[in-house]
Amino acid sequence: MSQTIRERTEQEEYSRLSPLAAKSAEAKRAREEKECQIRTKFQRDRDRILHSKPFRRLKHKTQVYIAPIGDHFRTRMTHSLEVAQICRTIGRGLRLNEDLIEAIALGHDVGHTPFGHVGEETLASIVGHFEHNEQSVRIFTVLTGNGKGMNLTEEVLDGILHHTGEGIPKTLEGQIVKIGDRIAYLCHDYDDALRAELLKIEDLPPVVKKVLGNTTSEMISTMVTDMIYSSMNSSYIRLSEEVAQAMDEFRHFMFERVYLSDTLKEERKKGKLIVEIL
């Protein structure tokens, strides 16, 4: 039989992608499978996640606002899609594996509880330990496929597990998602806060305006561009010192004025109570 489309794609990766990129042909699964003629392992992982029930359930899970009025506030699903797009752009700029990036980005938050992080914290206080990234891996390895999971590649599972916390993903693609996730949620939560009239543009710290910009579009563009040029030909993904400091200031501002604000305190109480009752 002549060369399959998958084999051609795998071959092209070695000539087209950076030497530092993860290669589909080298990806490992816990259980061996018959290869697809069309799709690489990472492409199949992405499709398995996208078509899964856990991913579809993300549309009912909110980010910050438990019961927002209107259709334009973000959910875990829209967040995951935004993370995927931001991170693919970065990956393309660095000639890394976009299929691996997309799979990690789409699957990174499926383990989240309802009601945002207050749901996660409440469940952890009840059962003793709960981390949404660990639950995401648990879903893909045990809680689907009649106990067999989806048999995703080690590279995808590693990126999902280490997208948050102190651990560093072993692939550059996973490292992109780790930072890209933060870029996405800070910017879209800021946008949602403006829509909810919790904030005004004038409230932004001066250093954030100066370095990152005033609008979500400007902020995303600044951080994505900086991340690409700061990480070029590097063995790890990073932001420049100036942009990283501005991002930290932006994050501190969002926690103080939005995530932990008195305005959302009642919503957090409601979410906590519902999880405790369940």
Regions found by a protein language model. Name each.
Residues K61, H112-G119:
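Short, conserved acidic/polar surface loops in the N-terminal third of protein domains
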Residues D99, A103, G116-H129, R195-E197:
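Post-HEXXH active-site segment of zinc metalloproteases
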Residues E102-G107, I179-G180:
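Short alpha-helix carrying the canonical HExxH Zn2+-binding catalytic motif
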Residues G107, G111-H112, A184:
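Short active-site segment of divalent metal-dependent hydrolases/proteases
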Residues R92, G111-F115, A124, G128, ...:
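Amphipathic alpha-helical interaction elements
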Residues M1-S80, A84-I90, N97-E98, F130-L278:
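Histidine-centered, transition-metal-coordinating active-site segments
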